[in-house]
Design a protein with these regions (language model features):
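Pro/Thr/Ser/Gly-rich low-complexity, intrinsically disordered linker/stalk tracts
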Residues: 65-101, 144-155
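Solvent-exposed loop/turn segments flanking beta-strands in beta-repeat/beta-sandwich domains
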Residues: 99-111
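Short beta-strand segments within Ig-like beta-sandwich modules, predominantly Fibronectin type-III
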Residues: 116-123
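Flexible, glycine-rich phosphate/dinucleotide-binding loops
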Residues: 50, 114, 146
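Beta-strand-rich modules
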Residues: 127-146
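Substrate-binding cleft of secreted/luminal carbohydrate-active enzymes
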Residues: 1-74
Length: 155
């Protein structure tokens, strides 16, 4: 065809994400990590997205890009994972303490029996725990490597 249908591209992105390996110890991750799978995807042409051809950008924003995601790790820039965070209880939530090398935090909150994922900048160290029965946090360094996940069950 002259161009791929937008729905085909969205379905391919969703399929790639469903096969991506998860961080060891992350909520919902298998007991063993490192299974083969895609860690990300690349779009051939940014102009297609910028011009929203065939509504592709809109479909991606409403579908697989509606939720936060981490940039795939770049292990060729070093394979030592960052130190993990420490979670401290405070009024209204938690305080994340971690290494100066942190670029962001990978945050999972268990709300109503479902794990919800978010990404926070490293300078944002306060974590709202309203409605959460558990929280898990990992340090993410500038090359996308994750630390071990710190899990805290909340009362």
């Amino acid at each position: 065809p002259a161009s791929w249908p937008a729905r085909e591209i969205v379905d391919q992105v969703s399929l790639q994400r469903s096969r991506a390996p998860r961080a060891a110890g992350a909520p919902g991750a298998p007991a063993t990590d490192g299974a083969a799978g895609a860690a990300g995807h690349i779009h051939f042409s940014l102009s297609t997205l910028a011009q929203d051809r065939a509504g592709l950008a809109t479909l991606l924003q409403m579908g697989p890009y509606a939720r936060p995601a981490l940039v795939p790790a770049m292990p060729w820039l070093g394979d030592t994972p960052p130190a993990g965070p420490t979670l401290r209880r405070r009024v209204g939530g938690l305080r994340i303490e971690g290494p100066a090398t942190a670029a962001r935090w990978a945050v999972w909150r268990r709300i109503g029996g479902t794990w919800r994922f978010d990404v926070q900048p490293a300078q944002d160290r306060d974590l709202d725990t309203a409605g959460a029965s558990a929280v898990a946090v990992a340090t993410v360094d500038r090359t996308g490597k994750l630390s071990e996940v710190q899990l805290l069950h909340l009362p």
